Amino acid sequence: MEPIPPSNGNKNNSMDKQPQQPQQPQQQQQQQQQQRRDQRNSKLNELNETERVRNRFISHEFHKLDRTKSRIDAPKISFSDSESESDSEFFLAKRNTNNNNQNNTSPTFSSANGKQSNLTQRKINTQIQSKQPTNNNVQPLTDDEGTINHSNHHHHHHNQNNNGNNNNNNNNNNNNNKISTPPKQEEKMTMNGLFTLRPSILSSESNGSSYRGFLNLLLILLITASFRLVILNHLLYGIRINLDLYKISEYHRWPGVMISLMINLFIIAAYLIEKAAAKQLLPDRICYLLRIINCAAVIIVPSGSIIAFSPNPASGIIVMILICTFSMKIISYAYENSKQRKLNPDNKKFVIDPTNTSIYPNNLSLRSTYWFMLVPTLVYQLSYPRSPKIRKGYLLRRIVEALSLSLLILWMVNQYMLPLVQNSIEPLEKIDIVLIVERIMKLSLPNLYVWLLGFYVFFHLYLNIVAEITRFGDREFYRDWWNSTGLDYFWRTWNMPVHHWMVVLIYTPMRRRGFSKNMGYFMCFFVSAIFHELVISIPFHSLKLWGFFGIMSQMVLIALTKNLMNGRNLGNVIFWISIVLGQPLVVLLYYRNFVLENPEWYRNVEPPTSPPVMPFY
């Protein structure tokens, strides 16, 4: 009877194991599914963390403009965001792909003290929807940031452990110090307060002096001298506006307008490509190839149309500016949607909240696509800051001001610049250095007026008009480039939409892939030089590469003058001299080349005679 219980026990064990045998493959399948979900979540977490740090890196690059030394009255203390700097190191560092994603922190190395720090992992959707502006007014940080943080931490615990007697002693010591150290100025002041140690107001030692009165005087002198030249020019030449230069060569075709309307084909193509990719109608490689073809065609096809139909140069320049603008928008549109599709592979948000257009792929509509093509920015995002309403009075004032100043620019070009450049053809052909220098200096004043007015009309008036109509909230289209003491600050601040596009679409991806800062800067200038050359050479049908090499040479000038002129007034003077004298020389060279290659444009235009020599009163 003793062997019976073991036999019964074996039967029971066998009976217990029998229902578990068919569950073995099911459990393995569940484990495999769980592993695939974990791997997928791990990859998504890594992409979300990379996207979060990418945004911090871009924000840190933009806020460098607030701390740059290449301007007048540059900040003496460098304000920095330590979190963004450490995030930037994490963004640029090579990470291990086999990270354990069960933890909520990812190791990074702080650029301040070289120690390992932890960055809390956040959801990218929270950052996009509730993004707070970075505050630059943080406490000043010296080079030894770790020492400051350690001292502050030690001081915090020290205050908690102090007793009341120590606090009283510290307060008494502080009061004694305040009483025993009066202001130095009061020690040197006489009894009646009439005399003290102080410099002259015009001395360099004087602080806080205002020279606004002198600025008003210089403005009055400038207006008076300019108005005198206007009267003198009218007495000698009369009204010399030539409307033949602005007429449309083929009224039945309107080549400039037709080429501009052609851009809509590429905008719709970009929308259809992203829509097909979101619905997975085409493979990823096919969508990637279609994006490249569309981005290249938006530049090549309209440029070839300008060469074929030959509109007048004024119309051609406007069309080429539109082509470059919309090509940059289409590239940014494809880049951001491709990135969002990787962050949302199953498009689950589309099912959860189909009405929210600030999440992918709900943003893929023809209306939102054209809204982005109209707003004054080149960087595509899922959401933008919006103004509450359209200010009709503000909009009307800006429109009237833009039309008035545009007519003023048209009058100045015809009345002053064209006669001067026409009179400069003969000295340029004879290579008469003295007359060439005289023409450049004579052309510098009207050219500077036209350039400044053109900047004000486009970047301040036109972009604000478009922003007001579309209720686009961010109106920082430029910064104080006129205070530049170096060319680096000028090129980063005079055209902020292009600067944003370069940082987001060129500089940041190159830095992410391990390229150096100088290589990123070089590629930004290279792309900018290509666009400048297209705007100039295509309308004038002349590929001389002067604009290309002129932009690329800026890198050499920046490298030579960056450390010498930072924050110095002399640097700002040299900057303005290069603007005042450099631009007229470029205008003369391109005009001479265009007249020699296209004499039919001015066949019926008589060159103006030189004015009689008159004494300067």
Swiss-Prot record:
Keywords: Acyltransferase, Endoplasmic reticulum, Glycerol metabolism, Lipid biosynthesis, Lipid metabolism, Membrane, Transferase, Transmembrane, Transmembrane helix. It holds the Pfam family MBOAT. Its EC number is 2.3.1.20, 2.3.1.76. GO terms for biological process: ether lipid biosynthetic process; glycerol metabolic process; lipid droplet formation; monoacylglycerol biosynthetic process; triglyceride biosynthetic process. Residues 7-17, 106-140 have a biased composition (Polar residues). Its main location: endoplasmic reticulum. InterPro entries: MBOAT_fam, Oat_ACAT_DAG_ARE. It catalyses: an acyl-CoA + a 1,2-diacyl-sn-glycerol = a triacyl-sn-glycerol + CoA; all-trans-retinol + an acyl-CoA = an all-trans-retinyl ester + CoA; 2-(9Z-octadecenoyl)-glycerol + (9Z)-octadecenoyl-CoA = 1,2-di-(9Z-octadecenoyl)-sn-glycerol + CoA; 1,2-di-(9Z-octadecenoyl)-sn-glycerol + (9Z)-octadecenoyl-CoA = 1,2,3-tri-(9Z-octadecenoyl)-glycerol + CoA. GO terms for cellular component: endoplasmic reticulum membrane. The keyword RNA-binding does not apply. A motif (FYXDWWN motif) lies at residues 477-483. Residues 1-52, 95-186 are annotated as: Disordered. It is a multi-pass membrane protein. Residues 18-34, 96-105, 160-177 have a biased composition (Low complexity). The active site is at residue 532. GO terms for molecular function: diacylglycerol O-acyltransferase activity; retinol O-fatty-acyltransferase activity. It is found in: Endoplasmic reticulum membrane. Pathway: Lipid metabolism; glycerolipid metabolism. The chain crosses the membrane at residues 217-237, 254-274, 306-326, 399-419, 449-469, 520-540, 545-565, 570-590. Catalyzes the terminal and only committed step in triacylglycerol synthesis by using diacylglycerol and fatty acyl CoA as substrates. Belongs to the membrane-bound acyltransferase family. Sterol o-acyltransferase subfamily. This is Diacylglycerol O-acyltransferase 1. It comes from Dictyostelium discoideum (Social amoeba).
